[in-house]
């Protein structure tokens, strides 16, 4: 099959790589334009563009795709069979969806129609979903509304964060995509639509995974401990707080159970009324902080200007005192 691959972040690389190594032909890659990503305002290529360059694949990085007649005509001239889209970053308009002979196909990192949109992995972690997965869908004009060809579900482990779950889903996306492309090749002359499943027949709630905003990264100590824990995992490694005027990225915490709270070794400060207050500083355990519900132990963090530190190192570096506050 002659394929044009659309993608931008690291997440897309495993899918492009597996297709390159297959018997299919990647005739071009479309990615987002180079962007200023460093303090020196240097233009940096997307991970997919950099990977495609190493593979000597023709690359397009249009500033816009809607009503871009020269670009659309260029795509038509390539006579491709399929568009494969993995985290490209823009919704493809109808005039582009209609170009490939056998449709545009997308691997979406959620159990659709749950978490349609830009940040499905983050929101599945943020909301404490027990399962997630990957769906291969035939793209339509709506936001992740297409009919599904394949789907596979995986359990979200308690230890998963954004990095680990993204890696798992990236590998799963690649595996399912190759399976889907092989199926499409074998069934070129058959009615594919009869093999597809409409999302509204799956009995799942429609939810939307909006883009993560700068304000989302702030830890709200007035929230429930479990929600704080989920946020830290979902936004790893960028969830942050403020201590004595310095930014502190929180990488790992533990929510104390009721039995642990009663454990005499913690000697928690008891006469507190506000969240975000330091309840105890215990050398071999860590810094214990109040929330709306249960206290949490700060296990791993990155202090502004320093490397990642674990609990004992954090105590040495921050020199915190019981009764001080972390600010959101």
Swiss-Prot record:
Record carries keyword Transport: no
HAMAP family, per the entry: Formyl_trans
Keyword Protein biosynthesis: yes
Residues binding (6S)-5,6,7,8-tetrahydrofolate: 110-113
Organism: Prochlorococcus marinus (strain MIT 9215)
Entry protein name: Methionyl-tRNA formyltransferase
Catalytic activity: L-methionyl-tRNA(fMet) + (6R)-10-formyltetrahydrofolate = N-formyl-L-methionyl-tRNA(fMet) + (6S)-5,6,7,8-tetrahydrofolate + H(+)
Enzyme nomenclature, EC number: 2.1.2.9
